[in-house]
């Protein structure tokens, strides 16, 4: 009888341990269940909501051999894409969602990894978070970028700099964007600079550029046939685009990226 009772207690203990382990697994799986292959297509991801103080903290951790994109990705996931604190442990995502996690990390790399300077070398530049607001010219659409304005309203006054290194993939006239430059960065992000008044000399498609190189000058071209200008105030429209896993082009919000490099404003005489 004692032997049977002992076996029964052992069986109960085993069952309790197994149930506890199962509950842990279920809780862990539930915690990461919202991460999908197409998470980078969600509106929450496209907002890129990372306050500058958190960006600075991640960069500080990067100096201790921690990977910026790794910390950024898990911080965004744990903060449900609107984080207030930094997270560093990605183990659950790597355990249960390794492929989905790597896809999302790659998307964040395309947006953030190559950015190294503010696009206008002046202290008097101002901008607001208008990503997603309604635009009507050329048909109903949303604003897919951030507009940067300077105190000087003259076209051609402010230089426009490349925020990243990369290759000039597109340039020339667009009915909406006017004279524009599109640069593909090393990690795959497409950085779009629009409404330029003119281009810097020797700028051409296929040319390699470095962060801080002058691309052209802030203007107000666009909203019409080639050469149209003056239909809106002088400003730079900055767009950032990535490719989704199924090769769909997606715009993301540049506002928070701009905030993260505002301290890296270059000084030029012009």
Model-derived regions, located:
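Small beta-barrel nucleic-acid-binding modules, principally OB-folds
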Residues: 141-153, 182-189, 241-252
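Acidic, glycine-rich catalytic/binding loops that coordinate metals and/or anionic ligands
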Residues: 210, 217, 231-270
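Generic detector of contiguous secondary-structure segments
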Residues: 111-112, 123-129, 191-208
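Zn2+-dependent peptidoglycan hydrolase active-site motif and core
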Residues: 161-202, 227-229, 233-234
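Residue-level detector of conserved, well-ordered beta-strand and adjacent loop positions
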Residues: 149, 184, 194-197, 210, ...
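A structural signal for short beta-strand/turn segments enriched in small hydrophobics and glycine
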Residues: 166-168, 206-221
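Surface-exposed, glycine-biased beta-strand/turn segments
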Residues: 34, 41-44, 70-179, 211, ...
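Cationic-aromatic interfacial patches
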Residues: 1-91
């Amino acid at each position: 009888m004692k032997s049977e009772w002992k076996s029964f207690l052992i069986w109960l203990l085993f069952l309790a341990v197994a149930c506890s382990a199962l509950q842990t697994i279920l809780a862990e799986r539930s915690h990461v269940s919202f991460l999908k292959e197409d998470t980078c297509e969600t509106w929450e991801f496209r907002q890129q909501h990372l306050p500058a103080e958190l960006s600075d903290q991640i960069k500080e951790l990067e100096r201790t051999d921690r990977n910026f994109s790794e910390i950024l990705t898990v911080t965004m996931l744990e903060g449900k894409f609107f984080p207030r604190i930094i997270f560093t442990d990605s183990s659950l995502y790597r355990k249960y969602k390794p492929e989905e996690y790597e896809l999302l990390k790659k998307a964040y790399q395309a947006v953030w990894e190559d950015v190294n300077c503010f696009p206008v070398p002046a202290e008097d530049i101002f901008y607001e978070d208008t990503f997603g607001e309604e635009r009507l010219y050329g048909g109903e659409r949303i604003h897919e970028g951030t507009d940067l304005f300077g105190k000087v309203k003259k076209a051609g006054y402010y230089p426009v700099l490349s925020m990243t290194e990369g290759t000039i993939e597109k340039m020339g006239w667009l009915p909406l964007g006017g004279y524009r430059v599109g640069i593909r960065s090393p990690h795959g992000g497409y950085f779009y600079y629009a409404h330029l008044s003119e281009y810097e000399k020797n700028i051409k498609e296929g040319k390699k550029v470095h962060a801080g190189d002058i691309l052209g000058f802030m203007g107000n071209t666009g909203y019409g046939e080639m050469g149209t200008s003056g239909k809106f105030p002088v400003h730079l429209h900055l767009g950032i685009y990535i490719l989704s896993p199924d090769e769909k082009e997606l715009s993301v919000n540049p506002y928070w990226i701009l905030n993260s490099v505002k301290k890296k404003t270059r000084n030029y005489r012009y």
